[in-house]
From Swiss-Prot:
Name of the protein in question: Fatty acid metabolism regulator protein
Gene Ontology biological process terms from the UniProt entry: fatty acid metabolic process; regulation of fatty acid metabolic process
GO molecular function: DNA binding; DNA-binding transcription factor activity; fatty-acyl-CoA binding
Pfam families: FadR_C, GntR
Subunit structure: Homodimer.
GO annotation, cellular component aspect: cytoplasm
Entries under PANTHER family matching the protein: FATTY ACID METABOLISM REGULATOR PROTEIN, TRANSCRIPTIONAL REGULATOR, GNTR FAMILY
Domain HTH gntR-type: 6-74
Organism: Edwardsiella ictaluri (strain 93-146)
Keywords: Activator, Cytoplasm, DNA-binding, Fatty acid metabolism, Lipid metabolism, Repressor, Transcription, Transcription regulation
Gene3D superfamilies: GntR ligand-binding domain-like (1.20.120.530), Winged helix-like DNA-binding domain superfamily/Winged helix DNA-binding domain (1.10.10.10)
DNA-binding region in chain numbering: 34-53
Gene: fadR
UniProt-annotated location(s): Cytoplasm
Its biological purpose: Multifunctional regulator of fatty acid metabolism.
Length: 239
């Protein structure tokens, strides 16, 4: 187990998460007593208690007053906030994890972008209006793409879509910085923003879902061609 965290709390958190992931503490099992666990990890009981509370909030553990702390099946109890952690824990599964994230993004984007164009076409035009002026770089496009999709999500009238995009932000933008290093991906995105603005201007909301899905397929094809070169540190925030 290689743990990169510098602070005692960070070390304890990574130790516990990796132990759960590697089935040292499998789902359904009980964690050792607080004193034993703090000695095992090498942190104070106060630090350990803070870490356990944080992991419980993220769905990794269930803490019950007067009872031992139980390890959860995190797939069933955690939220989008653990995506980056999962990507870091299992690099070999990163391509599949990202495929799943992109599929979800395309499916929900088809819904919320159609709703945004139908209900607030002028707002949609404003959201994509500055896209042609974006700096021609991977970082700039990754930030722009996230901001556009998030703004469209909040423009649809259902803020839950926006909250989903908030939850995807970390992994979304890191993947975006790698994906948009491809000039073809940047050109495709600009064409998408432009056409979306045209559909909003002409109030053609009924054509949006197919258009977004088509964009998802085209961008997915580019992404699949880049998967073999995914940097190992993509999920750590250094890519």
């Amino acid at each position: 187990m290689v743990i990169k965290a510098q602070s005692p709390a960070g070390f304890a958190e990574e130790y516990l998460i990796e132990s759960i992931w590697n089935n040292r503490f499998p789902p359904g099992s009980i964690l050792p007593a607080e004193r034993e666990l703090s000695e095992l990890i090498g942190v104070t009981r106060t630090t350990l208690r803070e870490v356990l509370q944080r992991l419980a909030r993220d769905g990794w553990l269930t803490i019950r007053h007067g009872k031992p702390t139980q390890v959860n099946n995190f797939w069933e109890t955690s939220g989008l906030n653990i995506l980056e952690t999962l990507a870091r824990l299992d690099h070999d599964s990163v391509p599949q994890l990202i495929d799943n994230v992109l599929a979800v993004r395309t499916n929900i984007a088809a819904i919320f972008i159609r709703a945004a164009v139908r209900q607030h076409p002028d707002r949609v035009q404003a959201i994509v209006a500055d896209a042609p002026t974006v700096e021609d770089s991977a970082d700039a496009f990754a930030d722009l793409d996230y901001r556009i999709f998030r703004a469209l999500a909040f423009a649809c009238g259902n803020p839950i879509y926006g909250l989903i995009l908030n939850g995807l932000k970390g992994l979304y933008t890191r993947v975006g910085r790698y994906y948009f290093s491809n000039p073809q991906a940047r050109r495709l995105a600009l064409a998408f923003y432009s056409r979306l603005g045209e559909l909003a201007a002409s109030r053609q909301y009924d054509r949006v879902m197919d258009f977004v899905r088509s964009y998802g397929k085209e961008s997915g094809a580019i992404w699949h061609g880049m998967q073999s070169g995914i940097p190992r540190d993509l999920a750590d925030g250094h890519a």
